[in-house]
């Protein structure tokens, strides 16, 4: 057996088979990862939008080491300075608000749902309007808010109080608002749904609708937040301010970390005992998060995400029209989807075989989520691999500069 086969065998014997793993990774640095058999890959999924500052950024690693050597965990029965500093930083980036810390995106969205219900309780408001094709997590309430029945199958009956409207359809959302509506929950970019950005007019219309009806606008920033779209938060591209929003994935710099940031009038309904997390805001995870945020600022990675995303999208767009099965490119910043007219899984597997890691989503979309630190040379290398794989799928052999003729 190879080393990879040995580890895969251990998984088969000892780990619940909820994931369809394909390779054993043992090392990461920047935009590259190494498997157990020594092969190197360009990582264009970043732990699913988690490693915005790349694998093992030295400043994040140093922050984790220093904090782990000082204080690892005390629970939220006590104050810690590192959590306070992180909350101050996030609130400042968000233009104000208060934070609640947890451990994942699903937990953060559960917190948003509980916050909205508690805020609306005195008026009998409990219902959440979310979007068709959305994804908000795998715990039962976040799953009920998710607008994709394939994830709910087998777990019925779903918790009540959730309805879905078509994404980017303001009239459809308005038609669902009742005197029981507590909040509208929306992603600025639907990631799991196929890299579909919210239209500016749609997000602004939701903000106006919520103001008119006295309900909360909640944004799920778990995948699109923290610089991935070229702004700190995806909703900022539309110039709107939600009443509360969720964060996770990239927040911990590679460690488990989730959070919500809520306007004070909303946040203050979470009084002692109303919600809690033993590990939320753990000092080591908080140190990693604060270091990650500082790296994004110090290395100007918001601008880098916008510039690198434009370069990558421009390269992908040359494939549209050139190859029959490539139909569109969409996304914002470094959250990019290559849309096919056939299942994307085969192309993703071909890319991996050529040394590039990507993801299939929404059946026909290849999803790319490279670190914000990705270099132009790495983007160009990825584009070469992608066109090689696409050409091969079309039965076309591409000439290369190093080939004769």
Protein language model features and the residues they cover:
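Conserved N-terminal phosphate-binding loop of PLP-dependent enzymes in the Aspartate aminotransferase
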Residues: 1-405
């Amino acid at each position: 057996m190879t080393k990879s086969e040995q580890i895969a065998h251990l998984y088969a014997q000892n780990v619940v088979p909820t994931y369809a793993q394909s390779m054993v990774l043992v090392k990461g640095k920047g935009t590259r990862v190494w498997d157990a058999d020594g092969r190197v890959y360009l990582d264009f999924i970043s732990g699913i939008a988690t490693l915005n500052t790349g694998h093992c950024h030295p400043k994040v690693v140093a922050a984790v080491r220093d904090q782990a050597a000082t204080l690892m965990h005390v629970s939220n029965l006590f104050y810690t300075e590192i959590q306070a500093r992180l909350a101050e930083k996030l609130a400042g980036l968000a233009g104000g608000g208060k934070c609640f810390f947890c451990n994942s995106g699903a937990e953060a969205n559960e917190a948003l749902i509980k916050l909205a219900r508690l805020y609306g309780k005195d008026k009998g408001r409990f219902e959440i309007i979310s979007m068709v094709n959305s994804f908000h997590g795998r715990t039962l309430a976040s799953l009920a808010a998710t607008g994709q029945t394939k994830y709910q199958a087998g777990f019925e009956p779903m918790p009540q109080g959730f309805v879905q409207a078509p994404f980017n359809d303001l009239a459809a959302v308005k038609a669902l608002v009742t005197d029981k509506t507590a909040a509208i929950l929306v992603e600025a970019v639907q990631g799991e749904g196929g890299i579909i950005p919210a239209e500016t007019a749609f997000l602004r219309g939701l903000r106006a609708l919520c103001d008119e009806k006295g309900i909360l606008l909640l944004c799920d920033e778990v995948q699109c937040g923290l610089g991935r779209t070229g702004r700190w938060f995806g909703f900022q591209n539309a110039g709107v301010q939600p009443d509360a929003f969720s964060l996770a994935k990239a927040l911990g710099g590679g460690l488990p970390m989730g959070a919500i940031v809520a306007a004070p009038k909303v946040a203050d309904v979470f009084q002692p005992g109303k919600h809690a997390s033993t590990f939320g805001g753990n000092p080591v995870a908080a140190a990693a998060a604060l270091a990650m945020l500082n790296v994004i600022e110090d290395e100007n990675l918001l601008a880098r995400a916008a510039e690198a995303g434009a370069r990558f999208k421009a390269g992908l767009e040359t494939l549209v029209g050139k190859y029959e099965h490539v139909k569109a490119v969409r996304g914002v910043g470094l959250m990019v989807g290559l849309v096919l007219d056939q299942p994307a899984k085969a192309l993703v597997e071909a890319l991996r075989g050529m040394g590039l890691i990507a993801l299939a989503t929404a059946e026909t979309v290849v999803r790319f989520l490279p670190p914000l630190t990705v270099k132009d040379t790495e983007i160009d290398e990825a584009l070469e691999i992608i066109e090689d794989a696409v050409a091969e799928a079309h039965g076309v052999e591409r000439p290369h500069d190093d080939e004769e003729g």
